Amino acid sequence: MTTKRKLIGRLVPCRCFRGEEEIISVLDYSHCSLQQVPKEVFNFERTLEELYLDANQIEELPKQLFNCQALRKLSIPDNDLSSLPTSIASLVNLKELDISKNGVQEFPENIKCCKCLTIIEASVNPISKLPDGFTQLLNLTQLYLNDAFLEFLPANFGRLVKLRILELRENHLKTLPKSMHKLAQLERLDLGNNEFSELPEVLDQIQNLRELWMDNNALQVLPGSIGKLKMLVYLDMSKNRIETVDMDISGCEALEDLLLSSNMLQQLPDSIGLLKKLTTLKVDDNQLTMLPNTIGNLSLLEEFDCSCNELESLPPTIGYLHSLRTLAVDENFLPELPREIGSCKNVTVMSLRSNKLEFLPEEIGQMQRLRVLNLSDNRLKNLPFSFTKLKELAALWLSDNQSKALIPLQTEAHPETKQRVLTNYMFPQQPRGDEDFQSDSDSFNPTLWEEQRQQRMTVAFEFEDKKEDDESAGKVKALSCQAPWDRGQRGITLQPARLSGDCCTPWARCDQQIQDMPVPQSDPQLAWGCISGLQQERSMCAPLPVAAQSTTLPSLSGRQVEINLKRYPTPYPEDLKNMVKSVQNLVGKPSHGVRVENANPTANTEQTVKEKFEHKWPVAPKEITVEDSFVHPANEMRIGELHPSLAETPLYPPKLVLLGKDKKESTDESEVDKTHCLNNSVSSGTYSDYSPSQASSASSNTRVKVGSLQPTTKDAVHNSLWGNRIAPPFPQPLDAKPLLTQREAVPPGNLPQRPDRLPMSDAFPDNWTDGSHYDNTGFVSEEATGENANNNPLLSSKARSVPAHGRRPLIRQERIVGVPLELEQSTHRHTPETEVPPSNPWQNWTRTPSPFEDRTAFPSKLETTPTTSPLPERKDHMKEPTETPGPFSPGVPWEYHDPTPNRSLGNVFSQIHCRPDSSKGVIAISKSTERLSPLMKDIKSNKFKKSQSIDEIDVGTYKVYNIPLENYASGSDHLGSHERPDKFLGPEHGMSSMSRSQSVPMLDDEMLMYGSSKGPPQQKASMTKKVYQFDQSFNPQGAVEVKAEKRIPPPFAHNSEYVQQPGKNIAKDLVSPRAYRGYPPMEQMFSFSQPSVNEDAMVNAQFASQGPRAGFLRRADSLASSTEMAMFRRVSEPHELPPGDRYGRAAYRGGLEGQSSVSMTDPQFLKRNGRYEDEHPSYQEVKAQAGSFPAKNLTQRRPLSARSYSTESYGASQTRPVSARPTMAALLEKIPSDYNLGNYGDKTSDNSDIKTRPTPVKGEESCGKMPADWRQQLLRHIEARRLDRTPSQQSNILDNGQEDVSPSGQWNPYPLGRRDVPPDTITKKAGSHIQTLMGSQSLQHRSREQQPYEGNINKVTIQQFQSPLPIQIPSSQATRGPQPGRCLIQTKGQRSMDGYPEQFCVRIEKNPGLGFSISGGISGQGNPFKPSDKGIFVTRVQPDGPASNLLQPGDKILQANGHSFVHMEHEKAVLLLKSFQNTVDLVIQRELTV
């Protein structure tokens, strides 16, 4: 039986036995690599119902196939069909047709014969239109035509009344036919990725619609008509441009999922609380500043995402969201969580990354189901003890680079409240700046790439900076949310963060600092405060550029200054620069005795001093007379003295009050950004993608605890302030918040005026330490402290909309104009605690970078108050530094008039009446204002008058008076009162008038930083420095020994940093076409205050710190368009240091540099030049150089590649391909700003010296002298240079913008290589100057030539701040002196290196680490200073670490404890250095300038 069955089983299938044909209805030939339809198919044409030919290579369908009359489903997707044969009409029973992923261009008209068709899938075909016959397929229920080329639908499309699903994603539809209202059964409609600019009117008539996708269109409004869709369950409107949601959306009663991500929403309607069935609400990536309380009515809400907004608080009603399971509030500005959050007991995942949380409520312990909690990138000091109740917690993220999801927590008592708290080694958190360097240009940005590469390659040896130091320095803790006045009380603890922990991640530190700085981004007054923070108590007005607005800012001294702020909706480069300059020409307090009258009055700021804020851009500034002659030897601070105090102050800076540092301001700032970054300080971030991030870092750096500087070391305080700017060694630079500190000086009265934005520089005079931020991209922070701050990830933090806001960057540049707060803050700094600095200018600036990028990416980018003001241009507020007691007598008012749009004029010159004594005012002339004018330089190097610059700055003859400012530095002593108010502004106004794109690190800044970076030398109570004085020709007249007298630390110290940063900013602006939309006026770019020599050193440090900012600048460069800029987080990026800040710093720095630079080593500047590659000097180096050559620093720092410089097209992004280096015009623009005309010779305080060359002051003149094709030449030169970076060339590259730009040797501190060449307009200003500038630049060029050596020298000099190195630097300066004759263009072409390598033996005692980072080596990232050299190079030196006085960035390590490092692999070198015991003997090669 069994056998029989088996036999039958086998036979039955056989047809012979069955006696009938088998019925085959389904054939599947999918994925058979068929090139044609198999013939076997035709054997079953009677029975075949389904045929699958998916994923073959069939090119055509045979006619025989259409004889299969019974075919109901034909599936031939993913083949090579080019058409559907008309014979398809014979398939009358066909119900489903799938021809997706072919090359079918159209449906045949007779498709209408397939009456039974219900489903057509024809996606991913080049179908451009549907035939009329298509609408006769009346049984069609599902139609999929995604990713086709449809531009319209047939007018009678509504005949398909049975249609239930219609997917038309990724077409080119702009409208829908009105007949579609007949589609009564339509439930799902997908119109995503089309070109709708408004919601089609017919939609609200499709009453049964349940799912609607309208994402990725161009909708600007979500109309109330959507509320008619009562059945709507799912609505996706993400990735549009929606600015408002109508209240009537509440009509969608059935709505469960509402997606509004990535729009431009600034608020949600209260009626959203009526969507009772809502389970998912996504409003991430918008511009929300608050959430409606009615959100608590969404009782069924399970997922809520409001990340990447500008929220400063969550509504307490969030506690009613009892069904909530996922809560994401990343990348906002939350300082705290509502206690009611504990009522959300069902939350399993909560992410609070990148906020400003300083503590968490105990009630979080009630969220028993919490499994994942992300708290990374906040400012938490500990966790509440109630965390022990979270039994289900599986992941607690406290850091982005945390190795394990859960890490053990220890219990300890809170130091203040004595409550039990949980902590571990990751606390307290440091604000971190994102290292986001986005490019807003389509072209490759070699400079940015190089910087990023260097960062990736950098190995940082632990600089054992205690966390506390980092905290103090990096964080401006209480400042964040405080009102400016509150801040004044609390004092900004802008302690420079030490490089210790952060040395490895200077950017991170900077970012942290910035984040820590709670300064409201939008508080322009804060920025003012920073400026006021400068020693001067004088009330400084934000740049008048915002003349349209009139604001009265109370000065620290209590005087009110009425500033008319012009709003320039879309400032053009020159205009912006001039605006910035105007800002810089703020009215100083009469108490300072400095009165700046700008020949071009923009507005009259009614100040007690009645300083005029003349804002006419074109008008040449009136000759400035220093009534007080600034020369008060007694008050003057010797460089040495300044330096020591500098070192001290960074550690214990006086409390800084950030004026107007109200978080609210941040919103304003976004507004400002929207208004085109009124405060140019933002420009860095905004200007370029790079810029934003760097700006951020700069921002954090700027928050130096100037306020906390010890009163005992008043001089030291100022010095430290300067140092913060200038000296990497001081944590201050990291704090870089000095700007804030400066703000602090600003009286609370100033704070309220948000509209007044102080230029970035104003906001960041102190912050210019942050210069390192700019530089940091390319280099390991040379000066750990300043650099770290500068290195803040802020730089990298992405400026979301940066690309869109190209204009903003420009504005930022402008914003730079400002008074360095440091000046005000100097010695009196601690005293002015009561003064409230304006809200963090950086916060505003932070926003600036780009509405999109910055917002999320630059938490630490504080858009400084300058930006915070709603004013569209940063220059509208010159910083009105509150008159904070400082080395400058509070009475000294800084008027910075930056009227000329070109900035070329000495318009910036205001008459500054300095008190004879410590209150001497430093004239910070916006570098951009005297783009090419040497006056500033003269001021800086009180001794010599730069004929070049001065020629150009022929603005009603600037009289440069050497004005010794005790408050400044000894070099500052001869702050000649240049006729250029901006120069005078320099320190006080932060010299921020020079608004350099922040993204571009300024070599100057770097140098500045370097100078101050040497913490120990600065710390010295007093020092003797040899200051080389230069005559007008910039020929060294001799070395003057300057003793650091005990002076109030010149505000310039911080300012220096600011100056430094401004320089960088400018560079960045130049670098990134967008950011550099228009080059800020040269003067602005180069505006520096003129600190004493010591201050100069500080300035150097500051610049050095700015070095890292180069990345920022670049970033802004690459990306922001002015619109985006505006969109950028208005105030959301408080952390981000606005480029203006950086600029301001540079400007400040200029003054400082001029004065301190005597002692500063020119090489450092040079080194700074080499910073980008070889060009980028180490931060410290740069600082030192900056000290010596303030002007240069600013410009040099700017990497051309970061932004292609489009001097002509303000808004247009230049093709970066030419090179990241700025066009000559860009460089030229920078040049004047960079120049701090303060004599280098500390002693030379002759007014006559300062007076030198008043005639050439007009920058426009210098522009005129530039060859017509100078930009092209510059770009070519830059590009060539970029492409072939030999070691010498690399330094040249660094010089790129800096190398030949500096007008004279003294300018070397601001090497203005090609990349620093300002635009033609600037050249005009610098007119004949340009060539003199060129001479100057040639100094820069020389610095570039000397870069390798100079960097070393500068480092040494800065480290020691002792005469030996300074002497060398002066000699190099002397060398430069002769070079002044060089043309900018000429210098551009030149690659010659004046430097020579020299070997040194250095012994470092580990404590606990070596305190420096290395790069290069075989298989290493390469040497940032000399990419062609495969040796091991020092890229960052912890400012206060064991190597701070011994090594400089750029040093090549030849041996270590007998081990040769010549041909060593990178990893081996790192391991070897780490393996050494306590003492390490190094043989290093440093390039010294001849």
From Swiss-Prot:
PROSITE patterns in alphabetical order: LRR, PDZ
GO molecular function, one term: protein kinase binding
Sequence ranges of Polar residues compositional bias: 677-686, 787-799, 1194-1217, 1286-1307
A single GO cellular-component term on record: postsynaptic density
Region annotation Disordered: where it falls in the sequence: 663-709, 775-808, 822-899, 1194-1218, 1238-1265, 1282-1312
Biased composition, class Low complexity, residue ranges: 687-700, 859-871
GO process terms (BP): cell-cell adhesion; establishment or maintenance of epithelial cell apical/basal polarity; neurotransmitter receptor transport, endosome to postsynaptic membrane; positive regulation of neuron projection development; receptor clustering; response to toluene
PTM summary: O-glycosylated and phosphorylated.
Chain positions with Omega-N-methylarginine modification: 1149
Modified residues (Phosphoserine): 439, 441, 443, 850, 869, 947, 949, 1118, 1233, 1288, 1392
Coiled coil stretches, renumbered: none
CDD domains per record: PDZ_densin_erbin-like
Tissue expression remark: Brain-specific. Highly concentrated at synapses.
Keywords: Cytoplasm, Glycoprotein, Leucine-rich repeat, Methylation, Phosphoprotein, Repeat, Synapse
Ranges of compositional bias, category Basic and acidic residues: 663-676, 872-882, 1243-1263
Family listed: Belongs to the LAP (LRR and PDZ) protein family.
Subunit relationships: Interacts with CNKSR2 and DLG4. Interacts with CTNND2/Catenin delta-2. Forms a complex with N-cadherin through CTNND2. Interacts with CAMK2A.
Protein name: Leucine-rich repeat-containing protein 7
Organism, as annotated: Rattus norvegicus
